[in-house]
Each structure stands twice: as C-alpha cells, then as structure tokens.
Amino acid sequence: MNLTNHFLVAMPGMKDPYFQNSVIYLCEHNDEGAMGLMINAPIDVTVGSMLKQVEVDSEQPKPNQASLDKPVLNGGPVAEDRGFILHKPKGSYQSSINMTDQISVTTSKDILMVLGTEDEPMHYLVALGYAGWEPGQLEIELTENSWLTVEADPKVIFNTPISDRWKVAVQMLGINAAQLSADAGHA
C-alpha cells in the first residue's frame, strides 16, 4: 500500500489533539515511513510577514498583496522551522518534486523570491513543519481507525477554504461528516 498523493483525514476520535480534524497531504509513503503536510491548520502568520522574518526580498515588485496576506499553515510537529510550499507546477526551483501534474512541493528558498510577484505559482500554500511516521507507524494508526484515506484532489488543497477542507475531504469518501462517529470498530 502506497498512499503518496493521498489525504489522511483525521477521524473524529483522533487521540492526538495535535491532529484533531486535520487533513494531511501525503508527500511520501514507502517502506521507510511517511511524510506529509497538514493543509488545514493556519497559524497566526501571513506569507508576507514570514517573508520579512526570513529576510527574503526580491527586486521584483509585489503587486499581488492578496497572495501575501494568505495565512501560513502549520504543516506538522517535525522541523517546525522548515518551510514547504505546495503549489501548482510553474517555474524551476532548486528543490522541487512534482507529485502530480497539478501538485509540486518545493523546499528551496528560491521559490520564496517570487511569492507575491507575477512569477508566483497560480496556486500555492506555505506550511512550516511536517508530519512524519516511522516505518509501519502510519499503517498501525490506519488499523486503529485514526485516519481515513482518499486520493488527493488539488481543488481541496488550492481552492477550498481552509476551514472547509476536513469536511470536503470526508465528503470525497461519500460520507456525511455530521454522521461520522468518534467510536470506530472493526467488523
């Protein structure tokens, strides 16, 4: 089972309060473990203020103020000072991986130079930190009914309001979120 390019959707009974109601985009899942980014946990920092904090300033004018006003997301509890940009593929950056033809993840600072400019990706989100699992750990959590899984949809990442992403991800499974029980069992 490889869940790369899938969403992990926290079940209502999630034991870890850090991940309650979270939606995680899995960037990698293999025999060595898993790595993903929470896509619905905004922090009290905007993209523009983050760029000032990391002293990124390009010579290009920043005409897209709305882009700079977007919130930065809490990507997860590991390496919280490390930035990850999920974006529609556009441009060439030092450290980018095309997950699909509609989703790339970039970790290099060069993408930060274009945020807020006409050269920025059409859709993007910035996350600090990531969620990580040791080999077999995610599989155990799946058998404990901590997570639902569904193939990732770029529209949920880039076009769905942050506060609606959990509900929309649940609906992708054909489930009414209001009827999802915190009590899970096995048949």
Swiss-Prot record:
InterPro entries, per database record: AlgH-like
A single cellular component GO annotation: cytosol
Family: Belongs to the UPF0301 (AlgH) family.
Tree of life domain: Bacteria
Family matches, as Gene3D superfamilies: VC0467-like, VC0467-like domains
Listed name of the protein: UPF0301 protein VS_2679
